């Protein structure tokens, strides 16, 4: 379950765009309105506390998962360059409500990872983090050797997610856990 006082990173400011203080944001969210709809947002630099800032406008770059965003008080290219590597956050208690079988990716962290071997479920590790570039990847730490492996989060490899009972079942191709 999601802790109500936590933050979820939904975007990363990767660079400035133009000379009027716009920034380029790499989306880590399925909800585009987070970068399009004006309103208050939260920014975080490295491990500093998040701070409020108002999103004035935004648009999605055609054919990409990036957005060009204008933030209140960021009016020059130099201002925008200062925000490079900042995270755009939302509070986990403000996450959209989902349908019964849906879940937020953040809820996968700390779930046990199980495989089906000889008709028995065997716990092999836990999800310690997520990576989201073009595809979602689960970062799993294996119990047997504390090795970290990346597992593509696709139905063929992760056929079952059980948030209520705190585990996922994976069906990795041969050799994936040995990489």
Curated annotation (Swiss-Prot):
Family: Belongs to the RimM family.
Keywords: Chaperone, Cytoplasm, Ribosome biogenesis, rRNA processing
Descriptive protein name: Ribosome maturation factor RimM
Lineage: superkingdom: Bacteria
Keyword Iron-sulfur found: no
Function: An accessory protein needed during the final step in the assembly of 30S ribosomal subunit, possibly for assembly of the head region. Essential for efficient processing of 16S rRNA. May be needed both before and after RbfA during the maturation of 16S rRNA. It has affinity for free ribosomal 30S subunits but not for 70S ribosomes.
Entries under SUPFAM superfamilies matching the protein: PRC-barrel domain, Translation proteins
GO molecular function, one term: ribosome binding
Domain notes: The PRC barrel domain binds ribosomal protein uS19.
Biological processes per GO annotation: ribosomal small subunit biogenesis; rRNA processing
Assembly notes: Binds ribosomal protein uS19.
Residues covered by the PRC barrel domain: 100-176
Signal peptide stretch: none
Pfam families assigned: PRC_RimM, RimM
GO CC term, one of those recorded: ribosome
Lineage: Bacteria, Bacillati, Cyanobacteriota, Cyanophyceae, Synechococcales
Localization per Swiss-Prot or TrEMBL: Cytoplasm
Record carries keyword Lyase: no
């Amino acid at each position: 379950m999601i802790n109500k006082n936590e933050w979820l990173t939904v975007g990363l400011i990767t660079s400035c765009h133009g000379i009027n203080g716009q920034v380029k944001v790499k989306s880590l969210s399925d909800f585009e309105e987070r970068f399009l709809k004006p309103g208050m947002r939260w920014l975080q630099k490295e491990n500093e506390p998040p701070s409020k800032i108002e999103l004035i406008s935004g648009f999605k770059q055609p054919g990409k998962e990036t957005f060009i965003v204008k933030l209140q008080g960021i009016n020059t290219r130099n201002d925008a360059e200062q925000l490079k590597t900042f995270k755009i956050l939302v509070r986990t208690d403000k996450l959209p409500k989902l349908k019964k079988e849906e879940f937020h990716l953040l809820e996968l962290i700390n779930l046990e990872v199980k495989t089906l071997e000889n008709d028995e479920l065997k716990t092999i590790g836990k999800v310690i983090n997520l990576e989201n570039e073009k595809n979602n990847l689960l970062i799993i730490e294996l119990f047997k050797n504390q090795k970290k492996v990346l597992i593509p989060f696709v139905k063929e490899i992760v056929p079952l997610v059980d948030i209520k009972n705190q585990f996922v079942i994976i069906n990795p191709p041969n050799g994936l856990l040995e990489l």
